[in-house]
């Protein structure tokens, strides 16, 4: 049995990028799209309910057909981005599928514009009711405004897009400098997570200085986006900056408030304590901003072969549920995993859903604990897609609040398996510390970013604009509230708000990560408590529903209510438990610790 990370086999989809079946499938899809438009464009409101139901089902099948070709093209491209034929094939395929689907753009637009009376009449069809939650999401961004206001919204959208392009162009043109040499933000970002403290500090400072040099331009973009959003929200009746995102996520405002307040309340007991422990491990009272994600020094990380990772992950899923274990095993047996690290392969991981086929996984396995957990994470997505594929292409389009449920749950199963198998106290210590680093990023950091966004948008609404010093202050205050007194957070990191442009491109989406992490943690805690009969069966039934129900309804079979702070506190309590265990292990691992670390910290003037 080899331990070489595998390559995937895409031939069950198409034999190669030259497979004539690709052209046949796209031609068939183009014909279907033209017929679809002839049948329905301008006619949706007056349709018979049965015809409306058939239109949705046909729209679903058409999306599934184009999704298959698009998925194949993306997988080929991301597996080797240097192959010019792959690049050309990917670009050509994207252009063709976009052109095909553009013929159907009217459908969602007309559904969004339906009066409530017309929609209620159409929804008497059984097939249409099957797609009820999808229709609800399509209508979430419905705008019922006069023509003058709509025209202004269009103008503002164009201004926002132009401003965001300026943001990207400016960021690309920054001359980042480290040790007198030009470098890139991605290289600096990687060094900011280095085990070498001096390197972390210098890289972080170089990143901050680079963004600071263009802060005035970035601030002008922030103001443009925030002002245009304020206008849009006012005209649509949204009372706070986050409400429009809540509506598109199909989440009540009270649920988001309960999540945010629960995370805020847990910050001292979880985040502050964890960073204080990190300072203690380094032999000091405080650590710097760039030390917050540093790996534990003095402990050699354990390495895993791919076969070992496979065994850990499959054992984790098998121990939870045999059917889920078999679904996971199918990815290995059917060569649906590309885990081989190689040049020109796109960084990162993904699970690719295919409504008319089986999902695939891409990652680059390097043998670290994070790689083992990433494998479990992506297999969780894959299992979710397999169980939900009966819902069709539209029923697999999960909102951000639930799309990470199965992946995080699978990661937790694998983490517990790793922890149970690990007998070395130092390695258990490292496992728990790495886990908490991820929790800080996925939960507490995201809520800090959420507060930063709120501060910026509220300032613009109150004062008409926000200045660079005010943005710096909003950023620093939000980070400090999350990190607590054990982290030094000053002007040396105050311009790093410019490194998160996604907050402008998709405002207020980041709480979705914390929602997913906390919701799944709470669900996992319920599983570990053992009080729910047939938990694995109920869990699989929940996943099999895909995107056909609101997030809050999915948890009803477990007796859980996401609008109650107590729900969120269950998951946050599990995170606190990790910190408790780290505190218990700390005394044995900090004796006679690493004078070199302390000495090094003094050399960089912290």
Predicted regions and their residues:
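Long, K/E/R/D-enriched contiguous segments that form extended
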Residues: 276-325, 384, 436-442, 447, ...
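C-terminal, non-catalytic "cap/extension" segments appended to globular domains
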Residues: 1-4, 17, 133-144, 250, ...
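Conserved helix-loop functional segments at active or binding sites
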Residues: 315, 319-326, 352, 381, ...
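Post-HExxH zinc-binding segment in Zn-dependent metallohydrolases
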Residues: 399-427, 435-437, 441, 516
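Short pre-active-site segment immediately N-terminal to the catalytic Zn-binding motif
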Residues: 301-306, 356-376
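Active-site recognition of the HExxH zinc-binding catalytic motif
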Residues: 237, 366-386, 407, 412, ...
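A well-structured
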Residues: 1-298, 584-591, 595, 604
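Catalytic zinc-binding patch centered on the HExxH motif and its immediate surroundings
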Residues: 299-304, 337-357
């Amino acid at each position: 049995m080899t331990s070489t990370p595998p390559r995937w086999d895409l031939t069950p989809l198409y034999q190669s990028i030259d497979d004539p079946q690709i052209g046949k499938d796209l031609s068939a899809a183009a014909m279907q799209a033209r017929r679809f438009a002839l049948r329905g464009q301008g006619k949706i409101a007056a349709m018979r309910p049965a015809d409306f139901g058939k239109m949705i089902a046909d729209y679903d099948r058409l999306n599934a057909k184009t999704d298959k070709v698009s998925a194949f093209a993306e997988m080929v491209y991301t597996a080797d981005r240097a192959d010019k034929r792959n690049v050309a094939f990917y670009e050509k395929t994207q252009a063709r599928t976009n052109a095909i689907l553009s013929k159907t753009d009217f459908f969602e637009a007309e559904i969004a514009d339906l009066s409530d009376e017309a929609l209620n009449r159409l929804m008497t069809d059984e097939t249409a009711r099957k797609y009820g939650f999808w229709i609800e999401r399509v209508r979430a961004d419905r705008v019922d405004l006069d023509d003058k206001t709509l025209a202004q919204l269009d103008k503002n959208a164009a201004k926002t897009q132009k401003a965001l392009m300026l943001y990207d162009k400016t960021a690309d043109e920054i001359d980042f400098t480290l040790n007198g040499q030009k470098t890139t933000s991605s290289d600096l970002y990687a060094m900011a997570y280095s085990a070498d403290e001096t390197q972390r500090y210098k890289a972080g400072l170089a990143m901050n200085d680079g963004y600071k040099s263009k802060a005035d331009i970035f601030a002008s973009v922030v103001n443009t986006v925030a002002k245009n959003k304020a206008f849009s929200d006012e005209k649509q009746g949204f009372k706070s900056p986050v409400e429009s995102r809540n509506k598109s996520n199909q989440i009540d405002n009270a649920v988001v408030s309960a999540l945010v307040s629960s995370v805020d309340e847990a910050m001292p007991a979880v985040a502050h304590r964890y960073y204080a422990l990190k300072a203690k491990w380094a032999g000091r009272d405080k650590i710097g901003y760039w030390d917050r994600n540093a790996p534990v020094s003095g402990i050699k990380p354990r390495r895993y072969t791919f076969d070992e990772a496979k065994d850990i992950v499959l054992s984790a899923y098998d121990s939870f549920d045999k059917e889920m274990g078999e679904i996971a095993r199918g990815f290995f047996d059917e060569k649906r995993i590309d885990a081989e690290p190689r040049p020109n392969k796109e960084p990162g991981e993904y699970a690719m859903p295919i409504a008319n086929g089986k999902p695939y996984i891409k990652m680059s396995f390097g043998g670290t604990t994070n790689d083992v957990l990433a494998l479990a994470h992506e297999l969780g997505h894959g299992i979710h897609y397999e169980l939900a594929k009966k819902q069709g292409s539209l029923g697999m389009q999960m909102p951000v609040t639930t799309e990470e449920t199965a992946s995080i749950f699978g990661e937790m199963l694998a983490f517990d398996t790793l922890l149970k198998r690990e007998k070395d106290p130092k390695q258990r210590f490292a496992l728990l510390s790495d886990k908490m680093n991820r929790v800080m990023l996925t939960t507490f950091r995201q809520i800090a970013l959420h507060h930063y966004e709120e501060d910026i948008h509220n300032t613009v609404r109150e004062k008409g604009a926000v200045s660079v010093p005010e943005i710096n202050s909003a950023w620093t205050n939000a980070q400090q509230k999350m990190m607590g007194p054990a982290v030094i957070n000053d002007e040396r990191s105050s311009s790093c708000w410019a490194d998160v442009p996604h907050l402008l491109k998709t405002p207020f989406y980041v709480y979705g990560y914390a929602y997913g992490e906390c919701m799944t943690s709470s669900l996992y805690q319920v599983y570990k408590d053992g009080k729910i009969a047939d938990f694995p069966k109920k869990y699989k039934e929940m996943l099999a529903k895909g995107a056909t129900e609101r997030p809050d309804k999915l948890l009803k079979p477990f007796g859980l209510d996401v609008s109650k702070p107590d729900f969120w506190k269950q998951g946050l309590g599990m995170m606190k438990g990790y910190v408790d265990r780290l505190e218990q292990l700390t005394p044995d691992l900090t004796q006679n610790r690493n004078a070199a670390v302390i000495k090094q910290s003094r050399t960089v003037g912290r």
